[in-house]
Amino acid sequence: MNSTSLYAAIDLGSNSFHMLVVREAAGSIQTLTRIKRKVRLAAGLNNDNHLSAEAMERGWQCLRLFAERLQDIPQPQIRVVATATLRLAVNAGEFIAKAQTILGCPVQVISGEEEARLIYQGVAHTTGGADQRLVVDIGGASTELVTGTGAQTTSLFSLSMGCVTWLERYFSDRNLAQENFDDAEKVARDVLRPVADELRFHGWKVCVGASGTVQALQEIMMAQGMDERITLAKLQQLKQRAIQCGRLEELEIEGLTLERALVFPSGLAILIAIFTELNIQSMTLAGGALREGLVYGMLHLAVDQDIRSRTLRNIQRRFIVDTDQANRVAKLADNFLKQVENAWHIEPISRELLLSACQLHEIGLSVDFKQAPYHAAYLVRHLDLPGYTPAQKKLLATLLLNQTNPVDLSSLHQQNAVPPRVAEQLCRLLRLAILFAGRRRDDLVPEITLQALNENLTLTLPGDWLAHHPLGKELIDQESQWQSYVHWPLDVR
């Protein structure tokens, strides 16, 4: 592999050290290596902000692992940044000097504002949805809050609170008591209060979280079959569960890994304070953060205004998809959606996911015609899809699995991006659009009227169409039968 196309970003965080190695390919990045080690550097800071020898040794040990991988990458294509703990430590110089010797490249201690800016860039390059956003990143010793529109930040704040420092301060007795949570939340709200007005002034349409705490919440919710949106009610529910467990070493929540458990209660308390103080309705997980911001900064790639469209284009190119046919199916599905939207009340994000499924529905053909829907579902489940959340990927895979043949109703109910009923409705529209665009020519798509009354669909074709299209009639009869097996009434006239 040509080493000039390789880039590395290393983030010396207060809780974990991370390394990301990517390859630039056709204007996008392909992840080759991700290494993360829990170093808990912030736990080695004493009251005088002196970093202990043990904490420094843990850090250097980790960097020796990273150094081996960096040998293959040109130095101008490596960026190493250090954040909150090394901003605070009075003896940071000692740690950094040895770190630079181990890695063989400069280590830059960045300001809180620069960290916030890079986090925002990482989110802007990798996360779909509305472009007016609030980004929250809870680190080990600092929390970054950024508002912005598109690629541009409108306000940036880095606050002195993090999941490691809050663990040492409010849960040092390892006791998960209500009082400990109350104290941790109260002080976190006090820290937030001075910046809350400016954040609210700039406003946001979506809120995304870009930290281990948010990642852990996402894993818990996926494991428990909840939808992926983080809300205050869900956070309070998890707090009560933690309090019931009593002690940190006994903390057991389905979906919470042992590795994340130690700093989970402290991160949870900070997140509850942020939700409460800023009146956040819901939050989803970001696709990337600081390390992605560093990489995209080195590559000088512009932020694509529509990340999901870029992702779909890249995948269509890679799997040699007939884009004319994909657009034909999408146009027809959108037409059907408009005809039933008053009856079915389908939200804009559900529409976007349906159209994404249309764009990808034929990728399975690149493997084999036989079982193409299975291949398509497998590919979507396992491909990196910037702009789509894990739950949205699961929904897309489920729709592609059910694009034709008998319907697997349980799979539509197991995804958690949209309610089961909505998944069923999207599936029905996708199947009909694929069926009626099957001749692969715009002039052969009939004029179709679609009406919905609850779950009953009535499909009206031009008067003599069925008589002149015996194969088409057979396919429609078969589809009608398949839909009836899962109690989806389809009346064709």
From Swiss-Prot:
CDD domains: ASKHA_NBD_EcGppA-like (cd24117). Pfam families: Ppx-GppA, Ppx-GppA_III. One of its GO terms (biological process) is guanosine tetraphosphate biosynthetic process. SUPFAM superfamilies: Actin-like ATPase domain, HD-domain/PDEase-like. It comes from the Bacteria. The keyword Translocase does not apply. Pathway: Purine metabolism; ppGpp biosynthesis; ppGpp from GTP: step 2/2. One of its GO terms (molecular function) is guanosine-5'-triphosphate,3'-diphosphate diphosphatase activity. InterPro entries: ATPase_NBD, GppA/Ppx_hydrolase, Guo-5TP_3DP_PyrP, Ppx_GppA_C, Ppx_GppA_N, PyroPPase_GppA_Ppx. Its EC number is 3.6.1.40. Keywords: Hydrolase. It catalyses: guanosine 3'-diphosphate 5'-triphosphate + H2O = guanosine 3',5'-bis(diphosphate) + phosphate + H(+). Catalyzes the conversion of pppGpp to ppGpp. Guanosine pentaphosphate (pppGpp) is a cytoplasmic signaling molecule which together with ppGpp controls the 'stringent response', an adaptive process that allows bacteria to respond to amino acid starvation, resulting in the coordinated regulation of numerous cellular activities. Belongs to the GppA/Ppx family. GppA subfamily. This is Guanosine-5'-triphosphate,3'-diphosphate pyrophosphatase. It comes from Salmonella gallinarum (strain 287/91 / NCTC 13346). The lineage of its organism: Bacteria, Pseudomonadati, Pseudomonadota, Gammaproteobacteria, Enterobacterales. The gene is gppA.
